[in-house]
Amino acid sequence: KDIDFANPANGLSTLIYTSGTTGNPKGVMLTNENILSNIESVRRMFGELEKTRSLNILPWAHIYSQTCELYYNLLYNNSLAICSDKSEFLNELKEVKPEALYLVPRVLELIKDKTQMIDKPVIRSVLPLILSRVFGGNLKFIFSGGAKLNADTKRYYENNGIKICEGYGCTETSPMVSVNHFESPRNVESAGKILDNVRVEIVHGEIQVNGPNIMSGYWNNEKKTDEVLINRNYRKWYKTGDSGRIKDGFLFIDSRIANNYKLSNGKFVNVEELENDIKKYISGPFIVFGENMLYNNIISTTDVDIKVINKNIDGYLKINNNYKITVEEFERFYTPKLSVKRKQLVNYILNNDC
């Protein structure tokens, strides 16, 4: 007897609002097929990861943790513990002893900063053992998503025996597009291999994605939907707004196109590259901005030696000023995935004479 499904494959499964880092949040409509096809694509790469235990710290209101952590582990009968409070995460790692973790770059950076303080020559040789104990002693790999992971942070973990499976995707792609496996073949400098059943093309430098994981559109926002969903060769493609390249089957993410800008002297600034170059001179969170200005500027929570930075970067990238605010002020502009709402933060600085 045929079964009448209450919610068919093309029926709405979830409505997830983007974090609004580049504008107003938009409701992303994802169907059952979108999510299930993405889970199947991940399964083809990793297998069912049977009897894997993990500890949740990320909000399930976002598709990365919802699809990759919640649905995937429920589907394959894995154990999933829920952290009682973010402040207890490190303590509960020792109790749960997870074999897999699903984290965002900011969490990995915070743990790196805590453990790096003990990275002294006399104990450097035992740092892998110390890190292993921090994560409970049974950790096999960490999935990192939600934003691009800093290369230095990735190398820190990899060099100390912890495999980082960095992936790339968007809410609009349900979310996974590519991911690095914890076994060969892998390229830790990349965002991994493109998943089965997902197509990626680079069009004028922009990453565009096609597949059954592409959203049906934005809720009650046909204009924005038409801006990002295009038809090409009888296929629906999603314009990610990210620049990147493909080499040897691996996807490399360069920057968020909307974050880049031109100075008033006509010089183009790749913000993420510049931030990565000067990160070693700044303690704590910060961003760079300077659109339509003569020089770049920094917003940070600490004092910054601008002279030292300018000695070590190209002249046209010169930093003019550091707008110092409190940690509490800066944290107001974090999304739930701990990325920064850049435009809102810059507007706050410029409108409040910080």
Map each language-model feature to its residues.
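Gly/Ser/Thr-rich phosphate-binding loop
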Residues: 99-103, 111-185, 285
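Conserved AMP-binding/adenylation subdomain of ANL enzymes
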Residues: 36-53, 60-133, 138
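Conserved ATP-binding/catalytic segment of the ANL
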Residues: 194, 201, 208-263, 267-268, ...
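Conserved pre-ATP/AMP-binding loop-to-beta segment of ANL
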Residues: 2-17, 24, 47-53
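Conserved AMP-binding A3 loop
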Residues: 13-39
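Conserved C-terminal "lid"/linker of ANL adenylate-forming enzymes
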Residues: 287-289, 310-354
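Conserved ATP-binding loop and adjacent catalytic segment of the adenylate-forming AMP-binding
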Residues: 81-83, 154-204, 213-217, 226-235
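C-terminal boundary motif of the adenylate-forming
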Residues: 241-243, 280-304
